[in-house]
Amino acid sequence: MFTLPYYLPQNLNKCIISESKTLEKNSLIYAQGEKPKEFYFLKQGLVGLYHSLENGKETLTRLYHANEYFGFRTIFSETSYHCSAKVLMEADIVRIFPGNHANFIANNPDFSCYLMKQLSNELLMQNTE
């Protein structure tokens, strides 16, 4: 697996960043079908993404560990969440509200490159599994 050095939220420009919030195991962060307003940085803990089928069955699609971002794929694609995010181990989470997406990307070029590398590595890993 590829490991990228993580990029701290406090280094982001022209966006609103929440204080870290501790969420207990089984807490719902966001639900499948909701429209996103923010994305997240996991300071510590474990978060799972679950996709629900029409028959009610849930499938774990991805795990996020400490120092990873999640929820950004959906917010930048301007769609609804395709999965629900749930806390699997007590987690400290920072919410990031980017506002205008084009401005956020322009004001955070290093972070934008970081996210592109993360997406590229995830695609590469999916193609080799």
From Swiss-Prot:
Protein name per UniProt: Uncharacterized protein HI_0804
Starting at the broadest rank, the lineage of the source organism is: Bacteria, Pseudomonadati, Pseudomonadota, Gammaproteobacteria, Pasteurellales
Signal peptide: which range, if any?
A: none
Q: Which InterPro entries match?
A: cNMP-bd_dom, cNMP-bd_dom_sf, RmlC-like_jellyroll
CDD domains reported in the protein's UniProt record? CAP_ED
Stored PROSITE patterns: CNMP_BINDING_3
Q: What SMART domains does the annotation carry?
A: cNMP (SM00100)
Instruction: List the Pfam families.
Output: cNMP_binding
